[in-house]
Structure formats: C-alpha cells, structure tokens
Design a protein with these regions (language model features):
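Membrane-proximal, proline-rich intrinsically disordered regions
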Residues: 4-56
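Short, conserved catalytic or interaction motifs in soluble domains
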Residues: 6, 147-150
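Short linear capping/connector segments at secondary-structure termini
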Residues: 14-18, 84, 152-159
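Conserved, well-structured interaction surfaces
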Residues: 30, 34, 38-46, 69-145, ...
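Core domains of carbohydrate- and sulfate-ester-processing enzymes
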Residues: 57-72
Length: 180
C-alpha cells in the first residue's frame, strides 16, 4: 500500500493561473486581451525614447531612406542607417522577440477564449481584436525580416522550431483573417 494517494500532489499552483484553471470567466478573457496590449508596450516595439539602444519606431525609421542622422556611432540607429549593422546585433533579436511575445499572447487568446461560457458575439469580438493585433505584429516582422515563421496557434515544445513562411503568403493570410 502506498502512503500517498494520487491526488496528494497538486500539479497546478494555487498562486498562479494555469491552462486548467484559467479561461473560466469573461474577466479572464479581458485580462488575456489586456496582456496582448501590455506586451505591445515593450520598448523594443514602439519606443520613441531616443536613447540609442532600442529598435522601436525610431530604430525602424533609421533603416529607411529617412535614416540619415549624425547621432554618433554609439547609437544603435547609426549602424543601421550607415548599413554597418550585423544580423547578430542585439536590436534585431529584441525586436523579433517582442513581436513574437505579442503574437504568442494573441494566439493563446484566440485558441482558448471559446472555453469561456459567454455570448458568442463577445467571444468573436475578443478573437477579432487579438487577430488584428497579431496581424499588426506580422506587418512589423515582414517589413523588417520578410519571410518569418507564421504562427496562428500556441506552439508545443515539439513545434518550437517553426519553419519560415513566405512574406506574400503571410500577407495573404492576414488579409483573409482581417475579413472576419
């Protein structure tokens, strides 16, 4: 006989949400959507702070024909505008990760919001908003990197190395998604 029963150990922490304890109420849906917007506050996405270390709007603009400036070589934007940046520059991975963080959160909402017992109209509204935010992130990614992994659902560990999808196919999918 065993000293412990099968239910002795809790697998879900009572102190934080999990896939089995979340997605119960409309408040959960609202918090999940808020988390999507919250991730968009990353200084690596839309930061207009001219501190020279981020690749927000300012950094992206320096990679266009408007990017000529004389800020000095210490600023991240200077290497981009002078075409001396390397693919290993940290700004690119930070920008990539920030976009995919928003995408991950949006995909979680789209995949799980239907588990919540609420009106279908509200479910569709939450999904549509998350899909629109996800589309914005893919516009960011494809404008900088062109072909990128196109993820429309949460990834499992075995799917973590997703292949790239052609930019044209991503844009077509986004346009179709936004017809909802």
């Amino acid at each position: 006989a065993s000293a412990c029963s099968d239910s002795f150990l809790q697998t879900d922490s009572p102190n934080q949400p999990s896939q089995t304890t979340y997605w119960q109420t409309e408040s959960d849906a609202l918090m999940a959507l808020t988390a999507c917007y919250d991730a968009m506050q990353s200084q690596n996405l839309y930061d207009d702070n001219i501190d020279g270390w981020k690749f927000g709007f300012l950094g992206r603009e320096t990679s266009t024909d408007n990017g000529d400036h004389t800020w000095g070589n210490w600023m991240l934007g200077s290497s981009i505008s002078q075409c001396t940046s390397a693919t290993t520059d940290e700004c690119f991975s930070m920008y990539w990760n920030a976009n995919y963080e928003v995408i991950k959160r949006c995909n979680m909402l789209v995949e799980n919001v239907e588990r919540i017992p609420m009106e279908q109209e509200k479910i569709e509204a939450y999904k549509a908003e998350a899909i629109a935010l996800r589309a914005l992130m893919y516009c960011n990614l494809t404008s900088v990197f062109r072909d990128v992994p196109y993820l429309t659902k949460p990834l499992t560990l075995s799917e973590a190395q997703a292949p790239k999808t052609e930019r044209s196919q991503i844009i077509s999918s986004l346009l179709e998604d936004l017809k909802i």
